[in-house]
Amino acid sequence: MDIIAQITSEFHLQAWQVENVVKLIDEGNTIPFIARYRKEAHGTLDDQMLREIAERLEYLRNLDKRREEVRASIEGQEKLTEEISAALSNAATLAEIEDIYRPFKPKRRTRASIAREKGLEPLAQVLYEQRPDCEEPLALALDFLNPEKGVETAEDALKGALDIIAENLSDDATIRRRLRNLFTVCGVVRSKSAKEEDSVYAPYYDFSAPVEKIAGYQVLAIDRGEREGFLKVSVTLDRPRAIKVISSVALKSTESPCTRAVLEAGEDAYDRLIEPSIEREIRSALTQRAATAAIKVFSTNLRQLLLQPPVKGKVALGLDPGYRTGCKVAVVDATGRVLDTGVIYITHSEAQKEQAKSTLRRMIETHGVGIIAIGNGTASKETEIFTAELIKAIGRNISYMVVSEAGASVYSASKLAAEEFPQFDVSLRSAVSIARRLQDPLAELVKIDPKAIGVGQYQHDMPKKELDNALGGVVEDCVNAVGVDLNTASPSLLARVSGINGTVAKNIVAYREENGAYPSRAAIKKVPKLGAKAFEQCAGFLRVPESKNVLDNTGVHPESYEAAKALLALCGYSLADVSSGAIGALRERVEGLGGVEEAAKRLEAGVPTLRDIVKELLLPP
């Protein structure tokens, strides 16, 4: 298979784009790096498109690998013909390859294999030929009696031969392909109750929907209901229609005495072998389709959650509401450092409620709280009313927001939280997390397993590897889109930066704690286990506000520093002007040079890269 041509066609791209993307991936470049700093190579494809290409590339390479494994296996059996080889070369899916391989695949003992051991394959071949002049099947079977092998009667011989024919028909790639397509187009998914009791699955106790039209959430609900023992599920197809497909392949003559027996073998093949097998395939395909769609929804939800605008420069108070155990409180400064913690009771007695007001008011006034984050879990509404009344009584400009507390309890009980806050109780760590996720959602949420953030239904039913890869990719893309402050970022945040793994992230923080703040991007080259390739991949996504080189605090990659300085000089500016914010007319001056395209020619730089440099230089410091 020409993988480049296949991807080019599927994604409606040009061959050079796909060739370059594949080359960049094979060279070990990360998707964020390719998307951001190799735009000339691929024509400015975004990170989501690049991830889809990478996933398809992996699938097609695995497909080719399996194709050659099957080819080698059949060749090793000395059964590879030009026709089979061509069919393998033309197979576009794993299912097609497995259909071709099915007759040659080593099998466990079956009724057909036992019949072959009894020497009944020649009888099966004679019957299947359906010659008009052949004898009646039972008469033919008399020549294959063998009491020593358990073939006592003509009926025994005929039954064994028909078992062989049934298995051969069930292994026929053409029959399986046609029936699979028929199930997909005309099949019906049905579910019935397995227990006489009410449950959340009641809507599916007498449910049916076409395979083509059943919704993903319905598939996932039915799957879960079946796993939990509430539902019996099947995929059905009009049987006469299915038998007709088999007959169209099996029927060789309408005048042969053997035809009726062969057609009966075809019906047995469908009922006993083909229908259960294809039903499993269809259900697996439906589940995969539903999971893929659900993962896309989860990814979109997670992206929106991570990219919520942060509330910068304010002391925040986090409230983790609760009834019996009270409402946990934490105050953090503008950098997220914990200033105060406590527990208040606002849903108990009036005396405790008044005490809670007094405690919270003291915290707000002592630390100059500017914003309050309220978790949206149990007792959230009561806590919101209580907070609104308190703010009104204080009479100062304090705002509050209700934030998702999904994953806060998971984080608070994690090893990471214990390392970060060994002095705090688990419940108080949740309040800290709630306050911080208002200040900087991305930096706080990367500490939590994306699956625990609560981004969609049925997420725990998804294929773990696929869900982890998809959500991990979203987190990585979001972190790299925003950029990370090298001198304040936690190991959790740094580990999501392009080119940096968990070990290197810890090394970066350890080096920072031992040697002080990094003075520049280049300084991380001294970090253990961070080599030249890792630096290339991560440098552009790291920010160093303290650096003497203002470009270290932008999204301009170090490899483009000379181009950035040359552009500034061409427009009558310097790096000092960038630092002071005195380059407001940069875009107009670039246009005065004939636009980005003309400037790129003069500087021998790529147009997309130069366009990004202009955009980065104009961002506020």
Describe these PLM feature segments.
Residues 1-19, 26:
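Generic start-of-chain signal for non-secretory N-termini
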Residues 18, 341-348, 371, 413-426, ...:
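Short beta-alpha connecting loops at secondary-structure transitions
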Residues 30-31, 42, 46-148, 340, ...:
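Accessory alpha-helical DNA-binding modules that contact the DNA backbone or grooves
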Residues 49-52, 59, 63-318, 322-423, ...:
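Duplex nucleic acid-engaging cores and interfaces of nucleic-acid transaction enzymes
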Residues 96, 225, 401, 407, ...:
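Long, charge-rich intrinsically disordered scaffolds of nucleic-acid metabolism proteins
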Residues 180-188, 319-323, 377-381, 403-410, ...:
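A glycine-rich phosphate-binding loop feature that marks nucleotide/adenosyl-phosphate handling sites
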Residues 281-299, 452-485, 583-621:
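Long, charged amphipathic helices and adjacent flexible linkers at domain junctions
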